[in-house]
Amino acid sequence: ISPTFMQTVSVFDVESKTWYLQNTTGDIPPQLTEFCSVLASAADGSSHNIYIYGGYDGLDYNANPSDDVYILSLPSFRWVKAYTGTNTHSRSGHGCIKVYPDQMLAIGGQHVDSTHCLEGGVIVNFNLNTLRFEDEYDPTKWSKYKVPDLVTKWIGGK
């Protein structure tokens, strides 16, 4: 872990079976560890967006973890800060799962202040289309994934 951790990412080329380093641009996240991630792809397959949520800097365990959401869009390798969170809602050491095309559930985790531990619930629902946490979860309500305008503004596309 270093302050430049997210500026360069490791990529595995399945065809040549080799690893290489790829530089990233945009709103590069600070150094983070113990975050969670999910992948959402454009309907036409033209871009793939890796959403990362939460985590902490890996050095100061007593510091507040992150509550921010970042998107790394491929193939442009551009970071976009999708959501700026709060210290009381933040968590690290949690897991994420994409239960529907437009929904990421974050499950569990921890916070340095046990009075704020997992504010909003043990499970929180982040909408990948609106880039907001939802107040409730209803498994009968979901939508197809649409690359958010915040991302297309920087990478192009529809």
Regions found by a protein language model. Name each.
Residues 43, 56-58, 110-112:
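Residue-level signature of beta-propeller blades and closely related beta-rich strand-turn architectures
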Residues 20-26, 80-85:
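A short beta-strand motif characteristic of beta-propeller blades
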Residues 2-17, 64-78, 118-134:
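Beta-propeller blade signature
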Residues 1-3, 9-11, 25-52, 69-71, ...:
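Conserved short beta-strand element of beta-propeller blades
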Residues 25-28, 59-63, 86-87:
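Juxtamembrane/interface segments of multi-pass membrane proteins
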